[in-house]
Amino acid sequence: MEIVHVCIQALSHYIFSTTEKNIRNEVVLITGSGRGLGQQMAILFAKRGAIVVLCDSPDIGNSETLELISSINNEKRVHAYTCDIGNRVEVKLLVERIQTEVGNITMLVNNATVLTSNSILDMSEDEFSRSLNANLFSAYWLIRQILPSMMRRNHGHIITMLGSTAVFGLGNFSAVCTAKSGLVGLMESIDHELTLGGYDGIYTTAAVSHYLTTHLFQLSKTCFNPVIPPLTLDYAAKKIMHAILINRKFVCVPRLYYLIPFVKGILPARAFLIILNTLVNPKIPIYTQHELSSKHNLTSSTQHIPRKRSHMSACQ
């Protein structure tokens, strides 16, 4: 009966939504806040009265985001730090510094992502390892540092941005897909541990979004576009923010992405690969690195453009 009650409650929660919680004076750490979705999320948090802590790599910085938020809130309510989140020592020092200068972090947004696009054979072991450090282990290190203070007060919220590579493996993105799939398991495991420990005041949210109209994806041209065009930053950020504010554990933007695990579950594996080949893989990569400006370079120094393949050869 308890399971039925929870299912009904979840369905009602999904259909009718609930009142958004008040996050004024919450200390929110956002990684990858210098641009893109991280910047947009930081602005939305600031508009709701949160104390926003910005974190990005030294080569990107937070100057633009800091300026935008300072025009919304008092400068004392926004703080900017630089950190290589792929470095465990730097992450540890960052959290200690924030706790000393700002206060205990009550909301963590794991948003930073380092994209690498190469086939698994063309990617070096060092590149693969660096990608996992930045995209997977950074979230683990941050949660390990921040979660104890949340548990002492039974209050907090951990948010992780996943992207579409968390729900299906995409060719030439093996490092990112590995990291994002790992984050799914990490978030589910943490949520279970919190439930077992009786920490009902600490929430988790995992957000999956379609690719966005940012510098990384502005040249994207896949067969998905007529059905699901690239999302604007404003639209994606507002949808994810609403899910956070009603404590939703998992959110997909757009909702069509909820169907992907179901489709993968009922279709033969080769059939799902044919769908991927038809809509994504054969002709054009998700983004074209060599056409981006130098300041937007990714971790991988070269862009691997997959050759056109037949459906059968790709599946065998």
Question: Language-model segments: which ranges?
Answer:
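The beta1-alpha1 cofactor-binding region of Rossmann-like NAD(H)/NADP(H)-dependent oxidoreductases
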Residues: D59-I60, Y81-L93, E125
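Active-site helix of classical SDR
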Residues: I143, A179
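Conserved glycine-rich Rossmann-like NAD(P)H-binding loop of the short-chain dehydrogenase/reductase
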Residues: R48-E64
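Non-catalytic terminal and boundary segments that flank Rossmann-like NAD(P)-dependent oxidoreductase
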Residues: M1-N25, I274-Q316
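SDR active-site lid
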Residues: E193-Y257
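Substrate-binding pocket helix/loop in short-chain dehydrogenase/reductase
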Residues: S119-I120, E127-S129
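Canonical Rossmann dinucleotide-binding motif of NAD(H)/NADP(H)-dependent dehydrogenases/reductases
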Residues: H13-V53
